[in-house]
Amino acid sequence: MHVIKRDGGQEGVMFDKITSRIQKLCYGLNSDFVDPTQITMKVIQGLYSGVTTVELDTLAAETAATSTTKHPDYAILAARIAVSNLHKETKKVFSEVMEDLYNYVNPLNSRHSPMISKETLDIVLANKDRLNSAIIYDRDFSYNFFGFKTLERSYLLKINGKVAERPQHMLMRVSVGIHKEDIAAAIETYNLLSEKWFTHASPTLFNAGTNRPQLSSCFLLAMKDDSIEGIYDTLKQCALISKSAGGIGVAVSCIRATGRYIAGTNGNSNGLVPMLRVNNNTARYVDQGGNKRPGAFAMYLEPWHFDIFDFLELKKNTGKEEQRARDLFYALWIPDLFMKRVETNGDWSLMCPNDCPGLDECWGEEFEKLYAKYEQEGRAKRVVKAQQLWYAIIESQTETGTPYMLYKDACNRKSNRQNLGTIKCSNLCTEIVEYTSADEVAVCNLASIALNMYVTSERTFDFQKLASVTKVIVKNLNKIIDINYYPVKEAENSNKRHRPIGIGVQGLADAFILMRFPFESTEAQLLNTQIFETIYYAALESSCELAAEYGPYQTYAGCPVSKGILQYDMWEKTPTDLWDWAALKEKIANDGVRNSLLLAPMPTASTAQILGNNESIEPYTSNIYHRRVLSGEFQIVNPHLLKDLTERGLWNEEMKNQIIAQNGSIQTIPAIPDDLKELYKTVWEISQKTILKMAADRGAYIDQSQSLNIHIAEPNYGKLTSMHFYGWKQGLKTGMYYLRTKPGANPIQFTLNKEKLKETQKTTSSEDEETKERNKAAMVCSLENRHECLMCGS
């Protein structure tokens, strides 16, 4: 049997040579668990004569990755093999790779099709010695296999389908793309990115330094007008943004209701549903950046709109196809008045914005007065019990996980953009809260801080380092506003006027574990608060320093910060004594701030996978989970838990199987000590009340909002109702992003008896009616006895 080498020559397969190559990459790994010989034996079994060395390396990497459940070091080894393979297949010198990317000729039409901009290339070539020597290629070996495969699949630029960039090249391209001729700042950013202190968002990593540097993640639009022109102009904006890889939030509350008169044609409106189906097809057709991700639009509606009941049905799996639009995402923009009416089971009036104008243009007391006035004037199209609508909302959430819940009055009351007008919606991921209008499309550029990195070897948290990195991030995101490619003019108008940015986090759960703080402990709750205090303080300080140099943003005059009112003041909270807020307020009074908004903890799905961290502000969902790559699916055990069990001599095949049998929970495994059971509770074992309380604690330092998922293993209407009301009363802006539930049955252990199925189908319809009655009773019970109701102990 022979292999074909990279130079085209042939060589016989040598067991020792393969083992030696793997052995060289095992430095620093736990030799009690990692066995290169075993990997070689498995690799040899999968070989055939004429295999290339590239394929051999790929097979070796995947073989190591399948052993990740034995020990997390296998994921590191798998990545090292894959990275070493990439290094052999790519050029080393950064400036040469950038030249190749610029000189690319498309073989289909023989046209010069540069993949980076001429400006980027010129800067790189003018500073090539500094930039080339600043890159530390060994840092490529710090990724785990699944992080590296994510980079390889979507982030590293390719020439004719073959990866041309190494991860370090990409990070330097991004840094130069942001900082241009400021080489010192580019190298500083490169070092922080490559050492994994933080990461820019996916669109920034995809597009920085290219011909179309569309570096923004989030776009928010309000319908331009309730007319064919307004609707299709907005739809065109959505298509152009989606084409450039942006996620979108759209406020649709101004669109007239079903059956209302249209003066221009002397006809009647078809309402929201047909319009949303057009949006649905646009999202399917125009994906984000040419097949990188599917197009994604979230539609925001206020619950007084006459079409609200139809809106809540749109994502459901059953029902008439022409009444469904399942590729969109749905969100409610909820005024406090609705929550009050649900609580007291008052009446709720459904209205058409054409007959009752201005409801989406005001909030708080002004909204309540206008709404009551329209009710008294008899302008409502339909009156229902508020709890009837609430029931429909809960039913939709239980079935589809949506609509998202955002509280309109909290979003406006606690916004630094109150001086601009009423905020009408959030974005696709519910963490951006910005003003939109007919001539302004709100935009946000994001980055996330890897919190696990700030835990020292002495198990202390380095707040100073967190502050210094935050200040760099603010400067980077502020620069992106000026160098960004804007898919529509209205987005550029908005972003350059108000200059918002969004700083989030990832690895909060990892930081707690490294500090040995159980997620619900008082220590974790204090650290949670102080982390966000620090980020908010440092972000304001950095933005104030930028304002001293360049002046405050255009619409600064009259905003709460200009009056000395910061986010925690709006929440009526007092910070801890970690930072000197009085001194900062004095600085801001003198110089202002350069950015209207600063913090927005986002979901971080892809970038957390790249850096090997748990997502965002979330607890671990399971201690055993799957990672998919193109070659297949791999099972992974929480690396922190695996390390702890290994150190205590508790890790073996039997333990692994017990954790799998318990679906990733360790709470009922007798051999595991109590301190580890506390530390490794999954989100299903943590009180959601604590999750909501911690969201409110950090919320006092978050001037936008946060992507907050709610996890209830088996939701009933009572639990869900009590949980929503608790979040609302805590003052949250985002009450819920997704409702996550556990599947009704474990697919691995589930078999079905056909006779049983027939019996079940007979009894289902009568049980459905009983279930509905029980759900209604549970919902009412939880509203009447929110503090005592046992059903609602979430």
UniProtKB/Swiss-Prot annotation:
It is an enzyme of class 1 (oxidoreductase). Disulfide bonds join C218-C444. DTTP binds at D226, S227, I228, K243, R256, A263, G264. Its main location: cytoplasm. The record marks Y737, Y738 as: Important for electron transfer. SUPFAM superfamilies: PFL-like glycyl radical enzymes, R1 subunit of ribonucleotide reductase, N-terminal domain. GO terms for molecular function: ATP binding; ribonucleoside-diphosphate reductase activity, thioredoxin disulfide as acceptor. It comes from the Eukaryota. The record marks C789, C792 as: Interacts with thioredoxin/glutaredoxin. One of its GO terms (cellular component) is ribonucleoside-diphosphate reductase complex. ATP binds at K5, R6, E11, G12, V13, M14, F15, D16, K17, T53, D57. GDP binds at S202, S217, N427, E431, T604, A605, S606, T607. Heterodimer of a large and a small subunit. Belongs to the ribonucleoside diphosphate reductase large chain family. This is Ribonucleoside-diphosphate reductase large subunit.
